[in-house]
Amino acid sequence: MADESERLNKPISTAELERRWQAVRKSMEAQSIDVLVMQNNNDFMGGYVKYFTDLPATNGYALSVIFPRDEGMTVIGQGPFGADRMLPPEGDGVRRGVRRVMSSPSYSAAPYTKENDAALAEKALEAYSGATIGLVGTGALPSAFVDYLRRGKLSNAKFTDASDLVDDIKAIKSAEELDFIRATAIMQDRCMDAAFKAMAPGKKDIEVAAIAEHTGHSFGSEQGLFMCASGPVGTAPLQANRHFQNRTIRQGDQLSLLVESNGAGGFYTELGRTCVLGKASQEMKDEFAFVIEARNFTLKLLKPGASGKDIWETYNEFMRKNGRPEEKRLYCHGQGYDMVERPLVRFDEPMKLKANMVVSCHPTYALAGSFNWACDDYLITDRGCERLHQFPEIITELG
């Protein structure tokens, strides 16, 4: 392989990419799938493309990957008409394992371009007109893209959903992936600390969140979600995105901040805490203590072999027993290249937990006088859960 470009932000090793390709191709062979097709258009929940290529999809621009069982990949992205380039076996220093690069100037905001990328994919798949084609991430593949492939020159091919095939491999983290994830968690500890230190009367919520984001950028973070909300102690301000972060902070206010960003290399974790410009109320302290109790109750359930359904039902029974609201949100889920990835702790998740999965756990509920939560990431092991963040498990009082 050619040396990676010096412009790349913390690339994964080629050995790790080859491990993934080998594992996926072994499963493809076992399931008689000849080629995989996937597409993402963002690096919040666009992890499939990143997993195979180490290149993020960004800005709403579609990035499609065709992954054959027996040869290099084809990558289709935004660019000039007619671009169709074959790469040498060693790659070009950026695209590893990629045989062919194609492009078109297509955009989701211009619907008449909806078949441009599909036409290129059809061209790249011409050798698979009678093959079995696995679609990966069917929740992200545009219907126009798939419909074009099904009705055109590939109409005799068999199409199957191969998302589970990839998810079963992608959800279990390698040693190298865990090194990246640990670094993301420590970065977020620093983001939270910097944001809380910048908290002051007269600042807007968005300014405090921006401190967390900027701190992450200084450690190589490329993307993230920074939700927050301030309000007087004795109320329950619900954290929200930037459009709702215009409130001016006052002395005595509380602020809840979620730092859900990727680190250098693209892996996500998330950290959530509350701080107060003054003193927390007794209700806030009591409910935070219960949140930690509920979180610890969940952690004991996060064992290899456990099911999302059983955890969901057992946790809600615990909440009812203790007079707290049942959880109807997604309060515990996997993370990796996707901000939210499988397994999900829900009543309908078929994937069982396994060792070396990384999950975020964030019990959350609002009462009339308090917004109650905590959020950290954990590594599931055969010996229990290891907390990856190191930020104190407290409500931070700033004066």
Which sequence ranges carry the predicted segments?
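Active-site neighborhoods and metal-handling regions in enzymes and metal-associated proteins
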Residues: 1-399
